[in-house]
């Protein structure tokens, strides 16, 4: 049986964890393993509080997380993405329904593109010769927070989403 209050408590904790991930990525260009592990480890509590069935709901979550990790591990191997970013997105895949996770990826790519352009321009304007490091955890966290707000805060959902259409 779903436990709405506990689910919202967990979502609040996830939101705080995403803010911490963004902050540490800006500050140190690193997302701590303990934070990613905590996000992943609390996903089963969220499944329980949401009333997800093991089959097919939890199976879908695990499948999307496995595919996410496999795809992003390739990006990590070619040094296109940091390890913390890979683990953060994989952990988020355990929390977010597959349809919403696809939306997260689109929003993340858009935010990441803007972030790259802004930081790239700043890098050029300051005439820095060092390699530009993009704190992609910011884009991941912002997209994750957008999904949480869009999916779980009825006050800001569209009428179609409230009716179960969106």
Stretches with model-predicted labels:
Residues 1-166:
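A membrane-topology feature that recognizes alpha-helical transmembrane segments
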């Amino acid at each position: 049986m779903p436990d709405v209050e506990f689910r919202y408590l967990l979502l609040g904790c996830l939101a705080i964890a995403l803010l911490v991930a963004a902050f540490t990525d800006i500050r140190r260009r690193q997302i701590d393993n303990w934070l990613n592990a905590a996000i992943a480890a609390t996903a089963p509590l969220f499944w329980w509080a949401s009333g997800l069935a093991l089959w097919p709901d939890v199976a879908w979550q695990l499948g999307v997380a496995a595919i996410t990790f496999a795809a992003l591990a390739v990006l990590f191997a070619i040094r296109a993405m940091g390890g913390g970013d890979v683990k953060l997105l994989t952990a988020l895949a355990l929390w977010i329904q597959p349809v919403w996770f696809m939306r997260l990826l689109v929003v993340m790519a858009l935010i990441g593109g803007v972030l790259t352009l802004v930081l790239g321009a700043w890098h050029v304007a300051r005439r820095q010769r060092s390699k530009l490091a993009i704190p992609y955890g910011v884009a991941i966290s912002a997209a994750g927070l957008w999904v949480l707000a869009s999916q779980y805060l009825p006050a800001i959902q569209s009428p179609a989403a409230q009716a179960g259409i969106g």
